[in-house]
């Protein structure tokens, strides 16, 4: 794998100019959970990086091309991202607003917001490399959110009910493995890959504990994507990078096993592991079954696709590292049902 090229392509997401477009929210109000809170990386980020001096920003065209009104909101894709689709599937609202959106409405606070930051990870080195919001700092944002929520709802009991009945969706590990370990090699002298995966799982547990101590009780923890099959990873050979996929699969296996055993550590909490690797790999292996025609190329934003493809719904990936809205919509229904079954 040409790691330097992959990293440069990831850095190509950067734009320093600041741009904001508000996004109207539709509330549903038929959910068995109170709210959705998203933490982690660009798979879930709905615009928290827009005002950062970061290489990981996408608040510019053609991002958001297929979003409502064709607006670039800071989501890493052509339209809605995974956190939006999960929020809708849980019956909350069809868009999950970014907490750092300066125009965030108070009435959105009770049904959930997004704290995730594109380019972030569990490892502090990952966030420093990309200029994103480290997961520990996302927890600090959540603390500030609780203070704001208390002021909006007017009483502690109601605020506690929102916090304890919400689903906490976590996506982390993608950038730690793809960037910090394989691309920059920042941790390769310190850790073997199995040891680094162990450390990432430990950091995941620390993140869960921080949220648990603030009242969180329902956790949906996502594994990584098949990182070796991202267009950025297969740009030279067009084949999936087996070793990178093996590293991601190893982390996912360790994470899943740990999640299964956390109930004894966190009394009263519920957990579900969200498999992203195998559903997306299924689209890559058998794209025609879901109406896709291209799995190796990105629709947009690569040297070979400076002009975006005409129909992103025919592509599994929007850019070098992120699935299209259609891909998320294709794999989400089973995941949503699993979350409902395990966290109700």
Curated annotation (Swiss-Prot):
Its main location: secreted. The active site is at 42 (nucleophile), 319, 322. The keyword Nucleotide-binding does not apply. It is found in: Secreted. Residues 1-24 form the signal peptide. Glycans are attached at residue 30. InterPro entries: GDSL, GDSL_lipolytic_enzyme, Lipase_GDSL_AS, SGNH_hydro_sf, SGNH_plant_lipase-like. It holds the Pfam family Lipase_GDSL. Its EC number is 3.1.1.-. Keywords: Glycoprotein, Hydrolase, Lipid degradation, Lipid metabolism, Secreted, Signal. Belongs to the 'GDSL' lipolytic enzyme family. PANTHER family: GDSL ESTERASE/LIPASE EXL3 (PTHR45642), GDSL-LIKE LIPASE_ACYLHYDROLASE (PTHR45642:SF52). This is GDSL esterase/lipase At1g73610. It comes from Arabidopsis thaliana.
